[in-house]
Swiss-Prot record:
Role noted for this protein: Specifically methylates the guanine in position 2445 (m2G2445) and the guanine in position 2069 (m7G2069) of 23S rRNA.
Designated gene of the protein: rlmL
Family assignment from sequence similarity: Belongs to the methyltransferase superfamily. RlmKL family.
Subcellular localization, as worded in the UniProt entry: Cytoplasm
A Pfam family this chain is assigned to: RlmL_1st
Domain of life: Bacteria
Gene3D superfamilies: 3.30.2130.30, RNA methyltransferase domain (HRMD) like, Vaccinia Virus protein VP39
Protein name: Ribosomal RNA large subunit methyltransferase K/L
Location of the THUMP domain: 43-154
Entry-linked PROSITE patterns: THUMP, UPF0020
GO molecular function, one term: RNA binding
GO cellular component, as recorded: cytoplasm
PANTHER family linked: RIBOSOMAL RNA LARGE SUBUNIT METHYLTRANSFERASE K/L (PTHR47313), RIBOSOMAL RNA LARGE SUBUNIT METHYLTRANSFERASE K_L (PTHR47313:SF1)
Gene source species: Buchnera aphidicola subsp. Schizaphis graminum (strain Sg)
Amino acid sequence: MNYLFASTNFGCEELLEKELRALGAKNLKVVKGGIYYEGEDSILYNSLMWSRIASRIFLCIKKFTIKNSNDLYKNTYNINWTQILYLEKTFLVKFRGTNNIIRNSLFGALKIKDAIVDTFYQKYSARPNINLLTPDVRIISYLCQNLVHIMLDLSGEALNKRGYRKFFNISPIKENLSAAIILSSGWKKNTPLIDPMCGSGTLLIEAAMISSDRAPGLKRTEWGFKSWKGHKEKVWKETLKKAKERFKIGIKKCLKNYFIGYDCNPDVIKKAQKNVINANLENIISFFACNLSHLKNPYQKEEIGTLISNPPYGERCKTENNLIALYIELGIMSKKYFEKWNLSVFSSSEFLLNFLQMKSYKNFCLKNGPLYCTLKNYEIFLNKFNNTNKEYENRLEKNFKKLKKWNDLKEIECFRVYDSDLPNYKLIVDVYKKWLVIQEYQAPKSINYEKAHKRLCSAIYHSKEILSIPTNNVVIKFRKKQKRKEQYQKLFNSNSFFIIREYHVKLLVNLIDYLDTGLFSEHRLVRKLIGSMSKGKDFLNLFSYTGAASVYAGLGKSKSITTVDISNTYIQWSMRNMSINNLINSKNIFIQKDCLEWIISTKNKFDLIFINPPTFSNSKRMKKSFELKRDYIKLMINLKQILRKDGNIIFSSSTHNFEIDLNNIKKINLYAKKITNLVKTKDFLKKNYHSWLIKHI
């Protein structure tokens, strides 16, 4: 009788127990992360060949308590290693756990290694070699409090490495976890299974292996037990023979076309097809390149199956907000075409799962590497989505139709289509080339959350459909009242910059990492005005943000450009914007400083100044706070000192209810003319944005 331990992913213990019982295992003891059990040699080999859920299977050699480090050595030395290992085979010791005796796992591993080699040396005057990378045998030691477990890894490589997956996408899900997802999904054999975002096809391949009675270990050639002296080659060969026979029978019983995978990336589909061939399942699984938005049910109405998916959940790049549209569409397409089917979705993001707009009937908590994930199973009911009020769709179509007649639209790649036009849809919708940014204003607490959420999901879906934007190119942002410093804090770290065209100018935007994108499109005609006024001028861009105005001045053949902002992030962004327009030279300088202090200290004079000051600022880098309504006259006095006699200031602001008092401006010997209507652009007619042209009297 062999005493064994099968390890598994967190949350898979119950599935593993059921599997081992079916294989004939005895005296099972479930612990966190695995199961202890007993079995004859046939059970040992069957569990290695047939376990879909186990990560590894170990032979338990000995367990003992220790009072000091010498106890660890002595107890290990007393094991008859010469009856377990071959002298000529390499080995490696892995030690897990620490206590007040063994404070370092490497120290524990060395103690056990010394005991093993000393055992061999005592008998043969020779010792086996260590191999840290590809050992023939792995000895695993677990220390829990003062109890040590010593085991032999019979698996070799982890059991999830079935041998068929030679090609995979970024961050593929492990095969044994995929099997656990399939077995927990509610899918039944001989019913259709569709994965609409299949990646390298692991979920479908694992399901097809179950359906065709193909053993997960059938294609593996390397095993840890082959370097174990207790290995029974005859029993193993019989196990292998039976597994091959079962697959030969099982594949014939398998119904064709019951496993279908789709993915938007044709290259990924090619990888999945190669993996299926490696698994000898190419006759029962089909893969197609297809966007989620084109997903339809290929089966007859009476055939009920399961949709299964492990969609991206933003952990790798920390970008949940640009996956919202994907989850919305998955929910919508499921309800639209797969009534009465089951949907099973695996994700680490409860936030994103909420956008499926479905209630699960069963949940499973599983661990995917370091991530705690949830598998949620849903029953798909008749789609009620089309019955929602169409006022938003109609308004968006109307707005877009108007904009298409606008000549400027041919010259710009960023424009606004919707800006809170309807009271029930407090959204901003902006197009950036082939990307869509939708911003939702935080609803008041008096608004029913479910209604607001449903409206948002509807708006997101119809926005991308009406504007013909790919689902993967939709970014959602949530706006709430916040301090200015929060507005410019980094939210994510995708570093997803790309260039958009605005007239003759190239500008970098980043739709994901910050609340704002790096370009205020409502300033578009102000920037154009700056470009037309800047020829031969010394231009100053204060509170420069990402320096778009500086680029216009440079392309307008200004004499020099000074770009000033307190944020290093935006100074660097400004430099990149200037660089892609070939405007980096010694006359164009960038200064990271508090703008209010800098204009007092500078000795330079300017012909053209653009300033778009904040409503309020209280940065740690500033000595005093700034409030526009309170301090703008003082600001204008300081600007006057650095403005040349025939110079101009373009002053812009989006501050609510802010107006320059022309009489107060006159008192400081400046003349101000409101030019808001001159610089108002068709896609921002309602925007609370005002501009003035100011000069010396």
